[in-house]
Design a protein with these regions (language model features):
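Glycan-processing catalytic domains of CAZymes
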Residues: 21-269
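C-terminal motif of bacterial Sec signal peptides marking the signal peptidase cleavage site
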Residues: 16-19
Length: 269
């Protein structure tokens, strides 16, 4: 499920940190599929698929759902933590003593162990099954959630580990004809597109945390921002009127409830 970066890491620090890392090779080029629609109106449907409001031309859905015909469709994959109910071997998840390490906000999700090249390769082979499902279903792109899991790893993982693993996943997505989206993790800066190969960004609450520029400076109009009704620092109309806000910005309920659910809320800039 969506999880926003918990670490407030400065961009300048991140560039110093990652500048010491030489990638094994340049990222695979973006596929020649449908271009990212910078003028889109988006909906974020991870809580369940439903017919979107009129005018929506970009939709993100879980990998277990079908893409929306006629729209640019993004397939959600929990790339750095286990999905609830998925059984992962002990040696591919981190441990806190004898217990599997969990995300404190999502206690049914374990943090995947990507601390070595061998573990990254083994974990990627499992995630690649979901990527292949997205491609076979007809999605245009994927987003890999919990890229920031290293911040919840009790120092077992580093940003460099996350970069190396993300590079494997993005390369595989590109091989299958899918564009790939960076999820949150503003500290990446230009490492996102230049080293890993991300094609766009999916961001949660960049206005709330006053960091939208960290993404638009890198990806321009290829940024989707989701703000949430329970954590707005100002009225949504003011968010939309701000030139710093990504053009593709929506307001959703925290649980991303489907249309028809009393908790459902959707607005778009």
């Amino acid at each position: 499920m969506p999880a926003r970066a918990a670490a407030a890491v400065g961009l300048a620090f991140a560039l110093v940190l990652t500048g010491c890392t030489s990638p094994p090779s340049a990222p695979d080029p973006a596929p020649d599929g449908a271009p990212f629609p910078v003028d889109a109106t988006a909906d974020y449907q991870l809580g369940g698929a439903y017919p979107p409001p009129a005018g929506v031309t970009l939709v993100a859905r879980d990998s277990t759902e079908e893409p929306l015909a006629g729209a640019y469709s993004i397939c959600y994959i929990n790339g750095f933590q286990t999905q609830p109910g998925d059984q992962w071997p002990d040696d591919l998840v981190l441990h806190d003593g004898q217990q599997r390490l969990v995300d404190p906000n999502w206690p049914d999700e374990n943090v995947i162990d990507i601390s070595t090249a061998e573990k990254r390769a083994a974990a990627a082979s499992r995630i690649e099954q979901a990527i292949a499902t997205c491609a076979a279903s007809g999605f245009d792109a994927v987003e890999f959630d919990n890229l920031d899991s290293y911040t919840r790893s009790d120092d077992h993982l580093t940003l460099d580990d996350a970069i190396a693993f993300a590079s494997l996943l993005v390369d595989r997505a590109h091989e299958l004809g899918l564009s790939a989206g960076q999820k949150n993790t503003s500290e990446l800066g230009r490492v996102g597109p230049d080293t890993i190969g991300f094609d766009f960004a999916v961001v949660e609450e960049c206005d709330q945390f006053e960091e939208c520029g960290a993404y638009t400076d890198v990806y321009g109009g290829r940024v989707i921002d989701i703000e949430y009704t329970d954590a707005l620092r100002r009225p949504f109309v003011e968010v939309c009127a701000d030139a710093a806000t990504p053009t593709i910005t929506i307001l959703r309920d925290r649980g991303l409830a489907p249309q028809g659910d009393p908790a459902h809320h959707y607005e778009s800039c």
